[in-house]
Swiss-Prot record:
This is Indole-3-glycerol phosphate synthase. One of its GO terms (molecular function) is indole-3-glycerol-phosphate synthase activity. InterPro entries: Aldolase_TIM, Indole-3-glycerol_P_synth, Indole-3-glycerol_P_synth_dom, Indole-3-GlycerolPSynthase_CS, RibuloseP-bd_barrel. Disulfide bonds: none annotated. Pathway: Amino-acid biosynthesis; L-tryptophan biosynthesis; L-tryptophan from chorismate: step 4/5. The keyword Amino-acid biosynthesis applies. It comes from Mycolicibacterium smegmatis (strain ATCC 700084 / mc(2)155). Keywords: Amino-acid biosynthesis, Aromatic amino acid biosynthesis, Decarboxylase, Lyase, Tryptophan biosynthesis. Its EC number is 4.1.1.48. Coiled coil: none annotated. The keyword Lyase applies. PANTHER family: INDOLE-3-GLYCEROL-PHOSPHATE SYNTHASE, TRYPTOPHAN BIOSYNTHESIS PROTEIN. One of its GO terms (biological process) is L-tryptophan biosynthetic process. SUPFAM superfamilies: Ribulose-phoshate binding barrel.
Length: 272
């Protein structure tokens, strides 16, 4: 592999796409649209409900697996997730590698009454106002993609608009950076975005070092209830699930199975 990582390549494309969108809709205009949007929902309250929360993802493709599912109606899928008991709906909006779009975000926001997460590679303030303009209540900030001053600035801007940031980490050093930035929700991704390799032990190594007031989200590697319970035992407050749901054949039931497991009396409870 060359010195450029998969993450570097994705971000290069994202920067070009953001510049193209900003050439059509200016930063000032997107800020006005964000101000006009309905106020964001309370993500923290949703994630602090009893049991292990399920963040269910509308995900068409990924760099590691290619096309995953032909999602003709993202609104219908999101409604199925909500009916199954999901706490939050995650929507991929990155186009080049994940085949997502802001149109998907719009469709999902209009279809559900629970919080919606914009999952993308956020590298510029424009994208934060854009997320709010399209109805997002939460967005993803990837520590590996941002230097510390930019991470802190983007997190502050996200929260200034009333949204919640899911701050994603893959190493102990990145977790320290997330905490230094003031993250209140930290996602531990088992997948290394620089190589796309998956190591499900990453969560159990990082989560114990996070303060009890931080919401801990396990990302990647959830294929069924056994994985959810394993993450719960390691201290997860919530799991983010995409591929396992969109390829399940029955997304509503797949979410419901996870929700049932996560709220069962035998499910390990996060230490608080």
């Amino acid at each position: 592999m060359s010195s450029a990582t998969v993450l570097d390549s994705i971000i290069e494309g994202v920067r070009a796409d953001v510049a193209a969108r900003e050439a059509v809709i200016s930063l000032d205009e997107i800020k006005e649209r964000a101000k006009a949007a309905p106020p964001p929902l309370n993500v923290m309250a949703a994630l602090r409900e009893p049991g292990i929360g399920v963040i269910a993802e509308v995900k068409r493709a990924s760099p590691s697996r290619g096309a995953l599912a032909s999602i003709g109606d993202p609104a219908e899928l999101a409604q199925a997730y909500q009916d199954g008991g999901a706490r939050v709906i995650s929507v991929l909006t990155e186009q080049r590698r994940f085949n997502g779009s802001l149109d998907d975000l719009d469709a999902v926001r209009a279809a559900v009454s629970i919080p919606v997460l914009r999952k993308d590679f956020i590298v510029r303030p424009y994208q934060i106002h854009e997320a709010r303009a399209h109805g997002a209540d939460m967005l993803l900030l990837i520590v590996a993609a941002l230097d510390q001053p930019v991470l802190e600035s983007l997190l502050e801007r996200t929260e200034s608009l009333g949204m919640t940031a899911l701050v994603e980490v893959h190493t102990e050093e990145e977790a320290d950076r997330a905490l230094k930035a003031g993250a209140s929700v930290i996602g531990v991704n088992a997948r290394d975005l620089k190589t796309l390799e998956v190591d499900r032990t990453v969560f159990s190594r990082i989560a114990p070092g996070l303060p009890s007031n931080v919401i801990r989200v396990a990302e990647s590697g959830v294929r069924g209830t056994a994985d959810l319970l394993a993450y719960a035992g390691a201290g997860a407050d919530a799991v983010l699930v995409g591929e396992g749901l969109v390829t399940s054949g029955d997304p509503r039931s797949a979410v419901a199975d996870l929700v049932t497991a996560g709220t069962h009396p035998s499910c390990p409870k996060p230490a608080r």
